[in-house]
């Protein structure tokens, strides 16, 4: 089976995960913005990665535009967000706000923790975070919105790696030697 990792992110965490996944599985890795879509039919499965920006998946427009080329392929999707992976309902709401149900039901999702380093954000993004923090009534949430964190670790990709290895075992059974 021939696979490809495609990602779209804003500040580097999604790209880092994509590179680690590609390295671990020996797969090519490409930015959604730079990959020639006419090459998509050559692949049997895809690992898509996207960061979340203002409650929406960064890769949403690319995925909607190109889904016809992907829909008969196996798709695993890793979402990278500031929201903790255990906040499944919140993480799922980002998917639902970004993609139609016809796409959602054909994708296997994985939620990976992200990073936020205030000094690396654009002036606009820092402003938006400060405004969001001011509007928050929860003091803990307010503080968290303005505090640097980096939860991007290589071991976070293990569930994605396991899923692909299982997929490949199922679709490429070992042949017995005569």
Language-model regions, residue ranges each:
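N-terminal beta1-alpha1-beta2 submodule of the flavodoxin-like/Rossmannoid cofactor-binding fold
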Residues: 1-71, 162-178
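FMN-binding flavodoxin-like domain, especially the glycine-rich phosphate-binding loop
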Residues: 45, 55-178
């Amino acid at each position: 089976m021939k696979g490809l990792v495609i990602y779209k992110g804003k500040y580097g965490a999604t790209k880092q995960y994509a590179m680690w996944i590609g390295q671990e599985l020996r797969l090519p890795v490409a930015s959604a913005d730079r990959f020639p879509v006419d090459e998509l039919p050559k692949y049997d499965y895809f690992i898509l990665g996207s960061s979340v920006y203002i409650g929406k998946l960064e890769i949403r427009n690319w995925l909607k535009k190109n889904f016809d080329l992907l829909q008969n392929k196996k798709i695993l999707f890793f979402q990278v967000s500031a929201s903790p992976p255990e906040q499944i309902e919140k993480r799922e709401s980002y998917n639902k706000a970004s993609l139609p149900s016809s796409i959602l039901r054909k994708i296997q999702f994985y939620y990976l923790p992200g990073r936020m380093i205030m000094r690396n954000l654009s002036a606009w993004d820092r402003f938006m975070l400060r405004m969001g923090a001011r509007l928050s009534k929860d003091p803990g949430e307010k503080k968290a919105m303005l505090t640097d964190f980096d939860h991007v670790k290589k071991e976070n990709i293990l569930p994605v790696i396991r899923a692909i290895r299982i997929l490949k075992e199922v679709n490429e059974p070992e042949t017995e030697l005569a």
